[in-house]
A protein has these predicted regions:
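Charged C-terminal helix
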Residues: 233-273
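Short, well-structured alpha-helical segments that form the helix of a local strand-helix-strand
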Residues: 160-165, 221-236
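Conserved phosphate/ATP/ADP-binding segment of small-molecule kinases
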Residues: 104-187
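Glycine/small-residue-rich loop that forms an oxyanion/phosphate-binding "nest" at active or ligand-binding sites
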Residues: 73-122
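Short, small-residue alpha-helix embedded
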Residues: 129, 199-230
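Short, small-residue-enriched loops and turns at beta-alpha junctions
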Residues: 69-72, 97-101, 180, 197
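Conserved N-terminal subdomain of the carbohydrate kinase-like
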Residues: 2-93
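Short pre-catalytic strand/loop immediately N-terminal to key active-site residues, enriched for Gly-Thr
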Residues: 190-201
Length: 273
C-alpha cells in the first residue's frame, strides 16, 4: 500500500465524511456501523424496500451484504443497488455464505443480473460460487458456509479472483490467509495481519464496509480496495500486538481493531496536508 495513497484517501474521507447505505448482515450490524464511524464515515441502515431508494440517493456509497437473506431483503438490495448504479455511486457486494443453500445461490444470481457492483469482497468459497453462477461451470452444490473451509493454493486464488473480476467487470477482493485483489487486468497479493481476525465474527463484513468507504474518494476502484485490504491487515497486526502486550484475549483484540483503525486514519489525514 502506498503511504501517499492511504494519506490522500484518509484526508478525503475526513473532509467529506461519506455516508454509507448499509443493507447488511444483522449479525454484524453494530460492528459495521462502529467501523465506519471509527474510519471517519457513517452508516445509514435502511432495509425496507419502501425507503431504500430514497436513502441511497442521499448517501455516497452502498454496501450490499447478503448475510441472513430473505426475499424482501434481496429485493431491497436490488432496488438500492440499481439506484446507486443510476447515480454513479460505488456499490460493494459481500455475498455472505453464497453457497450455503440453493435459495442463496438463486437470489444472488438474481441480484447479480440486476445490479453491477463496483467491487466484491468475499472469501474463497464465495468466490468459487460466484464464478460458477456467472459462467455455468463447476458445481455450486459442492460449496457452502459463511466461514470458508477452502484452502486454495495462492496461484489458484489469483486465478479465481481474476476470473470473477473479469466476469463481473469489477474489482474483487478475496480474503483468507493471504488476500488477493484483482480487477482482471492487475492482481496483487496482500500479506501480513493477524490470524485472530478470523476468530471474530464480522471481520469480513467490516472490511467490506471499509472498502465501500474508500471507494467514496477520488481513487480508482482497484487502488481503493487494495488500500482498504492492506490497511485492515495492518490494523489487525497492531491490534494483535496490543492484545499480546496486555496478555488479553480475543475480546480485547476485537476492541483494539476499532481503536487502531481510528488512530491510523486520523494520523494520516492530519500529517499529509
Amino acid at each position: 500500500m502506498s503511504l501517499n495513497n492511504i494519506e490522500e484517501i484518509s484526508f478525503c474521507i475526513h473532509q467529506n465524511a461519506p455516508k454509507i447505505h448499509c443493507l447488511t448482515n444483522p449479525v454484524t450490524m453494530q460492528d459495521v456501523a462502529n467501523l465506519l464511524l471509527a474510519a471517519g464515515g457513517s452508516a445509514v441502515m435502511g432495509q425496507d424496500e419502501q425507503e431504500v431508494e430514497e436513502i441511497t440517493s442521499f448517501c455516497h456509497g452502498t454496501l450490499l451484504n447478503t448475510g441472513v437473506p430473505d426475499i424482501a431483503k434481496i429485493q431491497a438490495c436490488i432496488l438500492a443497488g440499481q439506484k446507486a448504479n443510476a447515480l454513479g455511486h460505488p456499490v460493494v457486494l459481500d455475498p455472505v455464505g453464497a453457497g450455503a443453500s440453493t435459495f442463496r445461490r438463486k437470489e444472488l444470481q438474481k441480484l447479480l443480473q440486476a445490479v453491477h457492483p463496483t467491487a466484491v469482497r468475499c472469501n474463497q468459497e464465495e468466490a468459487v460460487v460466484l464464478c460458477s453462477l456467472l459462467s455455468d461451470t463447476d458445481s455450486p452444490e459442492k460449496h457452502g458456509g459463511v466461514e470458508s473451509s477452502l484452502q486454495m493454493a495462492e496461484r489458484d486464488v489469483c486465478l479465481i479472483a481474476e476470473q470473477a473480476a473479469s466476469l463481473l467487470n469489477c474489482t474483487v477482493l478475496i480474503t483468507g490467509k493471504e488476500d488477493v485483489v484483482s480487477d482482471g487486468k492487475q492482481t496483487q497479493i496482500l500479506t501480513g495481519g493477524d490470524s485472530r481476525i478470523r476468530q471474530i465474527t464480522g471481520g469480513g463484513c467490516m472490511l467490506s464496509a471499509l472498502c465501500t468507504l474508500f471507494l467514496c474518494t477520488d481513487t480508482s476502484a482497484f487502488d481503493a480496495v487494495r488500500a482498504a485490504g492492506a490497511l485492515w491487515r495492518e490494523t489487525a497486526l497492531e491490534a494483535g500486538r496490543r492484545t499480546d502486550a496486555e496478555k488479553s484475549g480475543i475480546g480485547s483484540f476485537h476492541v483494539h481493531l476499532f481503536d487502531v483503525l481510528e488512530e491510523k486514519l486520523m494520523y494520516t489525514s492530519k500529517h499529509k496536508f
